[in-house]
């Protein structure tokens, strides 16, 4: 549950807190405070990218590739950034308490059209 704090929505999590700073048609931007040892749920986003930028502390981001046995682990220290593609299970773990920023955005293929027929001019019959 988010609580309004000024213009910012803040929610408590088992691993810390998340503050919704901005949400619009292009992106979501969150400030997260992480507790050492905190781990978020393993989850995926069907359509959204998920980016992580660490301001302080240390965060580990695990990403399960399509071959479920292959797990990529990235250690993020202050100033580091990584992103996760849509459709991949991922999870973060707080190695050292700190603050990070989380971004979500979706992309679309400008050529995402599937034609069943082709255009034509109807003749006068």
Q: Which residues does each PLM region occupy?
A:
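Structural motif
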Residues: 58-60, 81, 89, 99
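A short, N-terminal "cap"/entry segment at the start of jelly-roll beta-barrel domains
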Residues: 1-31, 39-42, 73-74, 116-125
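Histidine-centered metal-chelating micro-motifs
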Residues: 39-41, 79-91, 109
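Short acidic-glycine-tyrosine-enriched beta hairpin
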Residues: 65-87
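Glycine- and acidic-residue-biased ligand/ion/polar-headgroup-sensing regions
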Residues: 47-66
